[in-house]
Regions:
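Multi-pass alpha-helical membrane architecture of UbiA-family
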Residues: 1-330
């Protein structure tokens, strides 16, 4: 009987295979929360340019390497912290996400819990590393609370994500800190100190918007949150009352913007351009139109998750309004 000889290629060492698997797992985890990371990172990037006069200060910088060092790392710090903390939340919520049929890497088994922990440590470690290289006291004072909020949001014993109002307030504060991190860069700190009303306008409007959006997300998870014993706003107030509250907040948002604009005009320093309240009014109006659709489907989990995804462009438009208002004073 003839013997058939088959050519066998070189065996791939097991450690190389494991490395490929590891890097792939990290990429999967990053991509799973990339959209949220970019949203919060853009809040920081927008903050760099939403202070009137900051472009002139940046343009006066003669050392390009110093300009890059003082601005570029900030959005990346926010990006790393955000994706890391969202994955931490996914890790804690793995059983709930599995029962809710959410297609995320950890509950679906695409990545292991160990790989998720590695991702969390690496992303936050990278953020802290960039922060230490900059050695800017103001940035440190803003980033450390961001990390702390991310931890206690998911930490089992405290778990802000389970607590009535505190969950959404924590998300709003985190988002506001992202914007402040950009506004108080080395080039914007002095301008913010001289015109604090600009800072107040940004954190008030952005805070309300992200607060409303986070509750819209909770509306899609009402059943799962109720079964898990979480006291989210929709669980406590009910869907209809929650939507009424969101509509009131969206109406208040442009009112606050116009009030702050009028205040700055009365004091004759026009810290806020009229472009800002006009833009905020447009965004709030679009959000109210979106709320009419939400009223019809808030009891349907899958439809609500789609509605929350449609909320993301509104965040982007609002960030653009802050920047445009600084660049085009009226």
């Amino acid at each position: 009987m003839a013997t058939v000889l088959r050519h066998q290629g070189p065996e791939i060492p097991q450690n190389i295979t494991s490395k490929v698997s590891f890097f792939r797992s990290q990429l999967i985890l990053f991509n799973s929360r990339r959209k949220h990371g970019l949203l919060y990172s853009l809040a920081t990037a927008g903050g760099l340019f939403c202070v009137p006069g900051v472009l002139g200060v940046i343009a006066s910088e003669t050392e390009i390497d110093l300009l890059i060092e003082r601005t570029v790392p900030l959005p990346f710090i926010t990006l790393m912290i955000t994706v890391g903390m969202f994955v931490l939340n996914d890790l804690v919520d793995v059983e709930l996400d599995r029962t809710s049929s959410k297609k995320r890497p950890i509950p679906s088994g695409l990545v292991s819990k160990r790989q998720a922990w590695t991702f969390i440590i690496l992303t936050n470690g990278a953020a802290v590393g960039m922060l230490l290289i900059r050695l800017d006291l103001v940035s440190i004072m803003l980033v450390l609370p961001m990390i702390l909020i991310g931890i206690i949001y998911s930490m089992t014993k405290i778990a802000l994500m389970k607590r009535f109002l505190l969950k959404n307030i924590a998300i709003a504060i985190f988002y506001m800190l992202c914007g402040i991190l950009g506004m108080t860069s080395s080039y914007g700190t002095g301008l913010v100190i001289n015109n604090p009303i600009v800072l107040l306008h940004m954190i008030a409007i952005s805070g309300i918007m992200i607060f409303v959006g986070s509750i819209v997300n909770d509306l899609g998870d009402t059943e799962g949150d109720r079964e898990a014993g979480r006291r989210t706003i929709p669980v406590v107030l009910g869907g209809e009352n929650t939507i009424k509250m969101l509509i009131i907040l969206l109406v208040i948002m442009p009112a606050i913007s116009w009030m702050l604009y009028s205040t700055s005009a009365e004091h004759a320093y026009h810290a806020i351009s009229m472009t800002a309240p006009i833009g905020v009014t447009i965004v709030a109006s679009l959000a109210l139109v979106r709320m009419t659709s939400i009223q019809k489907v808030f009891e349907d989990r899958d439809s609500m998750r789609k509605q929350h995804k449609k909320w993301f462009p509104l965040y982007m438009v609002l960030q653009s309004c802050h920047v445009i208002a600084a660049l085009l004073p009226l």
